[in-house]
Amino acid sequence: MNILHLVALSLFPAAQPAPAAAPLKVVTTLSILKDLAREVGGDLVQVESLSDPREDPHYVQPRPTLMTRAREADVFIEIGLQLELWGGKVVEGSGNPKIQSGQPGRVIASAGIPTLELPQQLSREWGDVHPFGNPHIWLDPLNAKDMAANIAQGFERVDPAHKSEYEERLKSFQTRIDNALFGEALVKEVGGRQLARRARDGGLDNWLKDKGLSDKLGGWLKRAAPLKGRPIVTYHKSQIYFAERFGLKIPIEIEEKPGIPPSARHRDAVVELIKKQGVKTILEEVFYERGAADYLAKETGAHVVVVPIDIGPDVGIATYFDLIDNVVNRLLESEGAAAGDH
């Protein structure tokens, strides 16, 4: 090797690989959104949630510490539908221009998803009514698919270079939801899109029967089949999407009105209804006090089942799939135990 060659090598060193792009910094209001963001983003995102799954998601305090955590976010994800009014205050207080309303980094996970209990008119007399419909959309697995799609679109807006990766991971997640809900064999034969459409219009059972496919239904829907048509009582209107998907009935809530604890008169009305309709299960979220539910159980013999509606180590639920598994299993246990009591 001559001197000129050595000089050339010193002037033009071997090209070094470009450093990997830093992951997107993602902040979510709820841990369930953190899980969906990780499903879609994988190693391309770094995600943190602002709330504790043991907290009522309506009433998180928009503390300065939360604003600080959102200050460097590339993407901010919320459910929307006025579930987390505190989220908007956190964003405004963060001073982060990338995640303000209308910016590419602001993701509303509920966008375009049909809601239940959309009020025809509003009045303070009705309690904490949500003007855009019930916001607890994530407890229907089909809605979780659409929420993940909204999150993927948000990531693609901010990071278009990795669009194909986000779309691939979204497709994988949506297929896993279909398999978990309908059973893998039925999804392979019919396709998740067809099954989801039939389930949304309420005609899945009849359609499967007409096609001779009823025996191939699996997943959560098969496991939860014994719950179909069963009445349960809930504390708040948190479970209506779950009940709609799995065919349960909720004739009354323990709350007299949304956000308003029960009066003695309303509590007595709930006791009467539980006895009249043979309700066996009182389903309550982890952040509500047990007093009213325990009283109803004592008066009627119904079982109180306490479940989280968000995920995290503090509530023993690691993923979205675990969340739905837990509610299905706990209800089956309660209804089975109730049946064995009589």
Residue ranges: model-predicted function:
Residues 2-14:
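Bacterial N-terminal signal peptides
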Residues 15-19:
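Signal peptide processing junction and immediate N-terminal pro/mature segment
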Residues 20-342:
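Extracytoplasmic metal-acquisition and chelation regions
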